[in-house]
Amino acid sequence: MKRPLTAIAAGLLAAGSLAAAAFAGPSFDADGKLVIPDQRDRWPMVGATYALSYEGDGGVTINTVRMDPESYDACVKTGKFPVGTMLDLEVRRPAEEVAPAKGGKTQGAAVGRSLHVKDEKAGPGTWTFYGYAAGAKTGNPIPRSQACYSCHDQHAGTTDTVFMQFYPSLKEAREVAVKPKS
């Protein structure tokens, strides 16, 4: 009886180690490109927006943001985004008249993806945006001259240039975790 229990315990420990290793923060190839993590669709969703427009005539989109599980847990516990945090943005066009629905919109074709990574490449506390195509294995850093950086710097508030107003469930979870004890 002891051996089967030992084997089960060892198996569970190994499975836990593999799960933790799957989300060990960002990694980069020899050219400095971000290696796109697998199974991002399993990451906790922290926000979704509809018809949010950044650039004027980009068309209506449904945007979904997911966060790597290790950083999510750390952020909820401490109220801070640890170095290595990855936020995955998926941008899709809305689809209409999808049977059997009689109205409304659902997610349609993907039109863009990017990862916002707290990698501190430009100094302490900084994040880098990495763009990538569907099915890509690596993502290229988006130049810091692009508007996404200045917009996040100017409008995201004091939370690591992350738009917490778009992620109410994450914001609420952080507030509960870091609430002063009375």
Where are these regions (language model features)?
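Sequence context surrounding c-type heme c attachment/ligation sites in exported
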Residues: 25-59, 78-182
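Short, structured beta-strand/loop micro-motifs enriched in basic residues and often containing a Trp
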Residues: 61-72
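C-terminal segment of classical bacterial N-terminal signal peptides
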Residues: 14-22
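Small/flexible residues
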Residues: 4-5, 68, 115
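Bacterial N-terminal signal peptides that target proteins for export
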Residues: 1-12
